[in-house]
Amino acid sequence: GDVGYINSNNTKIKVLDCKKINLADKIIFLHKVKVIKGYINADEVFNLEVNTENRKEISSHHTSTHLLHEALREEFGTNVKQKGSLVSNEKLRFDFNLNHPIQSNLLKKIEDVVNQKIYQNDKVNTEIMDQKSAMEKGAIALFGEKYGDKVRVVSMGKSITRKRIAWSVELCGGTHLQTVGEAIRFKIIGESGVASGVRRIEAVTRKSAMLYYEDKNCLLYTSDAADES
């Protein structure tokens, strides 16, 4: 989640993480913090300072998760469903139902589909609507997730069928990029099995993708230097 600082005239608090907690009658946001200076007083006025670069990296991995989900559905069929996911400032992790490993040529194909969408740089659209209307527009809902009467629909990419308002359409309350092009680059760094009939893909975007390629180049240069010696 978000990181940053909570400041007042006499107090400085570092926010290490933020979590959204769904209770029976309300939603709360839990902040994990470290007090660097001063004390936390209930009647004090604080200024909140969000680390926007960290949020951008998380948003990039979240938006790219939606693109990956749709690319998998396109390759293996619409029966592919999300079984779990994690988005951080460093990478994304996506679990989905599939009963066999994915060959390297298909992983490359899926990666290329996501990057093609990123290069098209379409706008990420968000809209609040009733759940029935969302389903009629082709939105994907997560199995087991509880939704209210009004839902937030996140869509991106040009639709290839009249049944959907966009290429990717999902019910989602998370933070996203404004345009998919802000993800810059998508790179799959791992594919594995985590349970019977469940596969996992790990990938990086933006800064993490650039660092990945820099590391690969460093290894290549080191190898070339070793060969020459």
Predicted regions and their residues:
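A glycine- and charged-residue-rich anion-binding loop/surface
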Residues: G1-S223, S229
